[in-house]
């Protein structure tokens, strides 16, 4: 989906802290409709705290947060239900209920927000979301303990998609996955963004993910957002953390990987045309 100029998330002057430790101070951020928006930063920069503030699980010291044009700070849970229905969240590690099956985990938000919905329809929706997330259909009756790490991530994603959200929050979705599993999750995220018209707020430390699927990236450091833009735009900034992160060995490897993938995509049509030319 093409990115629009409409802001889905706006954060202004955000200040967060725990006791004497200030995590954010004067943080500003805007996320546009239809983009995959990456958030990166070193340990302790409060990436997850920022997400939790946006979705109402963390109360900031000061600042303003709007989602879909609705003010979120100091809003009663019952008053925010209509906004909360419009987003889905995949927490780091999946955060599945261990005593519920995969299908029952997916059904949780449906039962919470639509208690009068026909149970048969809830079952049908859950089964569809399980498959949509890339899990086999027979994963529904399984418990989280029976799943691999990658399958747990997809089960958590299925639950995040249960309400047909417009906005999807992903907290370190590829953490703990092997390179093949991480790349597959990236491809799934990009595919869903296009087909479902999602806006994606993505916290990650995975450089391959940033290069592969993010439209824009925000860098957290010094208690605020120090830069927002595409990777080339960020590389034009002279902040030492940005330069070390994107121009370090792993950053160069990610760049080379993306460039090689682009070369292979460009070569594929030529090879196909050559093969047709030799037929008959």
Regions picked out by a protein language model, each given a short descriptive name:
Residues 143-147, 151:
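Conserved ABC ATPase signature
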Residues 55:
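Helix-to-loop junction immediately C-terminal to a conserved catalytic motif
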Residues 168-171:
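Catalytic Walker B motif of ABC-type/P-loop ATPase nucleotide-binding domains
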Residues 40-42:
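The feature captures the beta-strand-to-loop junction immediately N-terminal to the Walker
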Residues 164:
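Conserved catalytic motifs of ABC-family nucleotide-binding domains
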Residues 71, 119-138:
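Conserved ABC ATPase "signature" region
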